[in-house]
A protein has these predicted regions:
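Extracellular/virion structural assembly segments
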Residues: 1-51, 56-78, 82-284
Length: 284
């Protein structure tokens, strides 16, 4: 298990999109810069030449965490993330290579009679349980201004690729992992009404994932970083939560875009160690 990851200070709102790929004029790429995940950008078709984008940030930034949120990519889709040092996109400084959008499950995950026994792919029903979110942590980071993301989903039955939000931000990973007792669960948003007879009626709504954990053994410099994360993020700004980046099979379950539900103080329970707690609620 890798140490938990918090992405913060999303830089996408200051980005400028270049003319690249083919995107709808009624659902343009600028929709990605809104916080409403349902307000999407949509490609004009599903051709690989259309489903790609370029953007420049307001200045050179060190980007350590990336997410594509509320997309519609299907089980055979792949994608690629690249970083450049020049506006002509000719000097490459980072290349993720081609990555599967959805994981392949280990052989034996499904019963012989299951249609997924051989292809080992998640079903559409499994995928629909969660907000469709791609998360990516580059293995090396560079200070750069120019970014390119490509999606390869030409057989998408919708006939296009659409995206609700992009997260490109800073990253924090504690030197010592969160303490035992960390949790991640679902908090219902369903409304329950009770009739005079006692019968219950439900307005079912998507639940929000909530992560709670404590960092008990922070060095002094980490205590400063965590204080800065609280200050920068408040309870309104987006954070990207990744429970364990090494478990690629479950990233769609245990990584999400959220916000801090409360701001916790930095305490000093030991002579040279500091402590803080996090509660992160998923944004829908």
């Amino acid at each position: 298990m890798s140490n938990t990851i918090i992405g913060y200070q999303n830089r996408i709102d200051a980005a400028t999109f270049a003319a690249y790929g083919s995107w709808s004029t009624t659902l343009p790429l600028t929709n990605i810069k809104t916080r409403q995940l349902s307000k999407k950008a949509r490609s004009t078709n599903a051709a690989n030449s259309s489903t790609k984008l370029r953007f420049s940030l307001d200045s050179e930034r060190i980007i350590g965490s990336v997410a594509i949120v509320n997309h519609n990519m299907q089980k055979d889709a792949t994608w690629r993330y690249r970083v450049y040092s020049d506006s002509g996109y000719s000097t490459l400084v980072y290349d993720s290579g081609t990555i599967n959008v959805w994981p392949l499950m280990p052989f034996g995950s499904y019963e012989w009679e299951d249609s997924r026994f051989w292809d080992l792919q998640l079903s559409a029903e499994e995928i629909a349980l969660f907000t469709k979110t791609l998360t990516y942590v580059p293995d090396t980071v560079a200070s750069a201004q120019y970014y390119q993301i490509e999606f390869f989903d030409s057989t998408n039955t919708d006939g296009y690729v659409e995206l609700g939000r992009i997260f490109v931000g800073a990253i924090y990973q504690p030197e010592i992992n969160m303490s035992l007792g960390a949790s991640i669960g679902d908090e219902t948003n369903t409304i329950v009404d009770v009739a005079l007879s006692g019968a219950e009626f439900f307005d079912r709504r998507n639940s929000s994932r909530v992560a709670q954990f404590t960092l008990d053994h922070l060095a002094y410099n980490e205590s400063i970083i965590n204080g800065d994360i609280m200050k920068i993020s408040g309870v309104d700004a987006e954070v990207l939560y990744i429970y364990d980046n090494n478990t690629a099979l479950d990233l769609h379950r245990r990584a999400f875009l959220g916000r801090l539900r409360a701001l916790s103080p930095i305490s000093q329970p030991y002579n040279t160690r500091y402590q803080t707690t996090y509660e992160i609620k998923e944004l829908l």
